[in-house]
Amino acid sequence: MTLSFITRWRDELPATYTALSPTPLNNARLIWHNTELANTLSIPSSLFKNGAGVWGGETLLPGMSPLAQVYSGHQFGVWAGQLGDGRGILLGEQLLADGTTMDWHLKGAGLTPYSRMGDGRAVLRSTIRESLASEAMHYLGIPTTRALSIVTSDSPVYRETVEPGAMLMRVAPSHLRFGHFEHFYYRREPEKVRQLADFAIRHYWSHLEDDEDKYRLWFNDVVARTASLIAQWQTVGFAHGVMNTDNMSLLGLTLDYGPFGFLDDYEPGFICNHSDHQGRYSFDNQPAVALWNLQRLAQTLSPFVAVDALNEALDSYQQVLLTHYGQRMRQKLGFMTEQKEDNALLNELFSLMARERSDYTRTFRMLSLTEQHSAASPLRDEFIDRAAFDDWFARYRRRLQQDEVSDIERQQLMQSVNPALVLRNWLAQRAIEAAEKGDMTELHRLHEALRNPFSDRADDYVSRPPDWGKRLEVSCSS
């Protein structure tokens, strides 16, 4: 089957990119590809059998027209000016049979005009982390970019140490970022901001295109998508680590996996990025940061959208966030109805978990085994203060009884939303260290495991992290 690529970005937004081709690596070789995703995109298996090829930037497929996008942004709350694709190249936009499109973005593809002081490269460590994280999030049901392939090489890349150069093929319906809009707003080119908005509406909100109120309705949905995404992050214990405006997806996708981390111990102020000295991007601050980022996006739209309409949309953020968060947390607790004491029960559990440094994922998974008429629970052994747990657990079971739902029905719901497996940093690190020695077995094994996060397992993928794996510091270097 021949793949079809179109050039909407190149043709409709000429001021937003520089056309250029990838720079191949030395002795590049394909070490992993996403068979399930490739099948979904109707990619012939033969493309994965002819060396690095398109996956290593050595060839282009018919119809591809590679380019690097320019955008700007606020980083750690400070205006950073022009940024752009410093090491990534949009190879093309694949047109799928259902009329939707998928960007093919090659990360680590070499120098671009937007590389600033960088070398345009990515290292094996970061490409493995992003591939694992994006696929883990996808199978958790959280909107995200996807990983299609990884190529490693003999090209040395200099970070804190010398590491192997690598490339990741990332795919997504769109790579539109808040930072695209900021770029032209701060260049005082509001007509180009409007062009970006029109492009987004035409191709991703086409049902609004003929509505006279299209910009307001569109921004309302951007706010809602962002609020929903953040609610989902918070419920699975995901910390992004670097929520700069240039890393915010207009479509509400999880974008740009850098120093991310899933909670091990329940620690609301968890900071996964060792460069985040002030804790701006701590786990519990993510909802506030996302709103701040939406305010920056709203500012760029103010030349052609009424300020009252923008503020009304921003004011809806908290309610949308809390609604989605509340729904998901009630599911995690097994509540089939909404009762006034639910928030108090959840907050008391969180307080107990924080005091005891309980494992976030394991706590909710073990809670899924609760029998409403039995005081016995494997979760009890996870707490030092047994009396405090017993008191909370008794009230929790009384709340479950109010719903008049069988244990089996409720347990099935809870086990479908409380994962047994999340991508803990130590699991990723173990796969990385093996891959850097040439052994890809653990990379493939972990990828396969992450496809079934809600299934019980008997291996160490679902265990507490070992001592060396707790609070691994992760940097932005990639």
From Swiss-Prot:
- Give EC number(s), comma-separated: 2.7.7.-, 2.7.7.108
Task: Specify which residues bind ATP according to the UniProt entry for this protein.
Answer: G84, G86, R87, K107, D119, G120, R170, R177, D256
Q: Where does Mg(2+) bind?
A: N247, D256
Keyword line: ATP-binding, Magnesium, Manganese, Metal-binding, Nucleotide-binding, Nucleotidyltransferase, Transferase
- Which prosthetic group or cofactor does it need? Mg(2+); Mn(2+)
- Matching Pfam families, A to Z? SelO (PF02696)
Q: Name one molecular function that GO assigns to this entry.
A: ATP binding
| Reactions mediated catalytically | L-seryl-[protein] + ATP = 3-O-(5'-adenylyl)-L-seryl-[protein] + diphosphate; L-threonyl-[protein] + ATP = 3-O-(5'-adenylyl)-L-threonyl-[protein] + diphosphate; L-tyrosyl-[protein] + ATP = O-(5'-adenylyl)-L-tyrosyl-[protein] + diphosphate; L-histidyl-[protein] + UTP = N(tele)-(5'-uridylyl)-L-histidyl-[protein] + diphosphate
Query: Which residues constitute the catalytic centre?
Result: D246 (proton acceptor)
Q: Which family does it belong to?
A: Belongs to the SELO family.
The free-text function statement in the UniProt record for this protein reads: Nucleotidyltransferase involved in the post-translational modification of proteins. It can catalyze the addition of adenosine monophosphate (AMP) or uridine monophosphate (UMP) to a protein, resulting in modifications known as AMPylation and UMPylation.
Q: What protein name applies here?
A: Protein nucleotidyltransferase YdiU
Q: What is the lineage of its organism?
A: Bacteria, Pseudomonadati, Pseudomonadota, Gammaproteobacteria, Enterobacterales
